[in-house]
Amino acid sequence: MEKRSKPNGPRRVLLLTGASRGIGHATVKRFSAAGWRVITVSRQPFPEQCPWEMGPEDHIQLDLGDPVATEAMIPEIRARLAPDGGMLHALVNNAAISPKGEGGARLGTLAMPADGWLRVFQVNFFAPILLARGLVDELARANGSVVNVTSIAGGRVHPFAGAAYSTSKAALAGLTREMAADFAPRGVRVNAISPGEIDTSILSPGTEKIVQEQIPMRRLGRPEEVAQAIYFLCTEASSYVNGAEIHINGGQHV
């Protein structure tokens, strides 16, 4: 039976990066429905017309592309966790960037400028480990879980995802295994989910061809299907799952 956070009891707490749309938005809804407190991280300030039942105390404005600011924010995040016993039950590293060229063109290894590579890796790769390492005590206190969001583009050359994005996701998959080995003795599980073509606002023209030619299920994935897998990895249902990367792509990877 699924455990829920009780209204008058200890709340489970999720820290989620990249919550404004798509997979992140669906993840907020899935965890909130189960009674979790969800703290979001974004470059943008807390929106006045927030679509969720949360206040400014559950939003952290942070540019994950700034490594100094990211590390400096750790004490503030800890302070936000204090009302819940200084416990963090789940960290989901969902935020990512994938710059495009003129007219939305894919940026390959020869086209992406050096500063673009650095920023992509800072947001997609370094920020996840900076947050997880900085909050390891809070995660350990709750026997928590970390979920890194990788991508099918991390395992193959993708027609739309840029080279920097793809290699950063491949690196994040490797980081997930390393973290799983290092964090597990502290009681913290670390896993990844690897989405394929998901029906979000960032789909590129030509995705329909991929759906028809490469995906055995012949459809796009839904954000809520990804959110459900993330939720699974953050609950007791996956209590012996550690170091895994779950492919959510309708069989596109086979």
Stretches with model-predicted labels:
Residues 98, 108, 113-114, 145-171, ...:
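Catalytic loop of short-chain dehydrogenase/reductase
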Residues 143, 184, 189, 241-243:
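Short, small/polar-rich loop/turn modules that mediate ligand/substrate recognition or access, typified
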Residues 222-253:
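C-terminal substrate-recognition "lid" of short-chain dehydrogenase/reductases
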Residues 137, 181-182, 239:
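Alpha-helical segment proximal to the catalytic Tyr-Lys
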Residues 20-21:
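Conserved glycine-rich cofactor-binding loop
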Residues 102-118, 211:
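Substrate-binding pocket helix/loop in short-chain dehydrogenase/reductase
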Residues 94-106, 251:
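Conserved NAD(P)H cofactor-binding loop of Rossmann-fold oxidoreductase domains
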